[in-house]
């Protein structure tokens, strides 16, 4: 499944803010989009609107609006968390810094690669890092899932231990977690952030392995303007 949280997490600690994460959203259809709206959070004084539509190309477009429901200015970044099944290979283009390096990743071909093995992650480990391009990809079997988003410069990322990219691994699943720009919102103001989901079958002649230049090229083609 997939959810949305406000970043940084240290502002609301744990567990996730229920109004944004697990409580029911109100939903309505507007044109070709499904629009889902949360209640205002209590521990994080924000609300979220999710606008979802399928594009002509067959991709899924997700537009998130994060609104400051507080009476004072507050700084937040949008944060999408998508859980995929155990196993698989995750990768993104390596950026300027790694913030949290708990996962055993490999750096090859200008990219950071994580091959999930549920036996080696204990109770959960995380990587947070900058990316050099606005995508985060994951291969399961021969299906490639790519999230595309605006690349966020270091100066616009949420404070450490947050970062533009996070990969969280537990024994039974992996989380793919991009974040948008960190900005101050006046009371009642909103910020909008867009993520595209692409799916593609990996051709049989492409090896699914750490460092695969062909996999990187396929992800680049899917996210090309």
Predicted regions and their residues:
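Surface-exposed acidic/polar loop and edge beta-strand patches at domain peripheries
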Residues: 1-61, 69-225
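Beta-strand-loop-alpha "switch" segments that mediate conformational coupling across diverse proteins
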Residues: 64
């Amino acid at each position: 499944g997939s959810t949305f949280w406000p970043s940084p997490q240290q502002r609301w600690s744990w567990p996730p803010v229920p109004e944004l994460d697990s409580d029911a959203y109100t939903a309505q259809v507007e044109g070709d989009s499904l629009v889902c709206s949360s209640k205002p959070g209590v521990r994080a004084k924000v609300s979220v609107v999710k606008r979802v539509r399928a594009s002509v190309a067959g991709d899924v477009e997700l537009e998130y609006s994060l609104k400051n429901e507080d009476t004072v200015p507050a700084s937040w970044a949008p944060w999408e968390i998508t859980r995929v099944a155990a196993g698989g290979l995750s990768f993104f283009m390596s950026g300027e810094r790694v913030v949290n390096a708990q996962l055993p990743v490999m750096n090859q071909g200008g990219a950071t690669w994580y091959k999930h093995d549920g036996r080696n992650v204990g109770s959960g480990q995380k990587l947070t890092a900058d990316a050099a391009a606005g995508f985060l990809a994951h291969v399961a079997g021969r299906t490639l899932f790519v999230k595309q988003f605006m690349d966020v410069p270091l100066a616009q990322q949420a404070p450490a231990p947050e970062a533009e990219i996070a990969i969280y691994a537990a024994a039974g699943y992996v989380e793919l977690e991009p974040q948008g720009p960190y900005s101050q919102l006046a009371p009642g103001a909103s910020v909008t952030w867009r993520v595209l989901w692409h799916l593609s079958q990996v051709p049989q002649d492409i090896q699914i392995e750490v460092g695969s230049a062909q996999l990187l090229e396929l992800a680049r083609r899917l996210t090309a303007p």
